[in-house]
Amino acid sequence: MRLSIALGAVLTVLIAVQGEETTNSTTKYIDYSSLKKFTLAPTIQQSSTDGSQVQQIQIPISTRPDPRATEAPTPAPTLAPTPAPTPTPTPDPGPWTTITIDHDQVKPFAQPEPVTISEKTAVKFKPQLHITNGCHSYPAVDEAGETGGGLKTKGAPSAGCKGSGWGSQVYGRSGWYQDVWAIMYCWYFPKDEPSSGIGHRHDWEHVIVWIDNPAVENPKILAVTPSAHSGYHKYAPPNADTIDGVTTKVAYDSKWPMDHALDSTSEAGDFQDLIMWDQLSENARRALNSVNFGRPNTPMNDGNFQPKLAKAWPFQ
């Protein structure tokens, strides 16, 4: 009897405990919301040995930065290229205004040291000028572009023009013409007066020396053409007694009542400082391209140089 009561009590206790555990037990889950997010690596598939199953293995890769890595330097900003400045256009100087001064106040250009082949050749073949009668040659223009006013035709043919106290000038310009190198040498005279009262204010005369090639060691004179009354004397080749080495000799002469002209001569003459067209100041070139000297004209300016070479061409 006592044993039955004891067993019943034990059984009652066990049932009560089991019921309490059953009541209090719940399914527990892992809260993933507090975990870091992971990036899954690509899936790796593995086959089982019997080929019945395929196992997939995913390896989580943390996106958290590696503290051992150094930060990439911030690149310097690329600046836009600076555009080249637009050059200021050269203003149009407008028409040339002639400034005239006394013929004996025009200062010549000093003869520059020749640099180019054409300059050296022009100096080498610079001619001698012999004044038979009439005026001596004078500078026509100065560095500022002022030009000589010339002289009236009165008094003796050489009155007032027997030479400038500043020195004289010969002007030059050269270039190829029909495969021959032409060097033009020009002189200015304040008046052309064969005798008192006749002639004209201002005079320009020139001679063209034609050579084979300025670049060879010993260029050869092929022809000489002195200017004469709007035309030319043409010597191809020149007479031997009119050449001194490589120097052409020309005379400024008037056969009355004709105006003055140049011609080849055997008489020795004088040299003048040579200034080539490209060596003149800009104002001097503008003046010689623009100033009206009356009946005579500037032989070597832009409008006359090529036409005069064509007219003086000495070869048939």
UniProtKB/Swiss-Prot annotation:
Keywords: Glycoprotein, Secreted, Signal, Virulence. Glycans are attached at N24. Residues 74-94 have a biased composition (Pro residues). It is found in: Secreted. A motif (Hepta-peptide GHRHDWE motif II) lies at residues 199-205. Residues 1-19 form the signal peptide. Its main location: secreted. Key residues/motif important for the effector activities are degenerated in most NLPs, including the nlp24 peptide consisting of the conserved region I (11-aa immunogenic part) and conserved region II (the heptapeptide GHRHDWE motif) that is important for phytotoxic activity. This is NLP effector protein 8. It comes from Phytophthora capsici. The gene is NLP8.
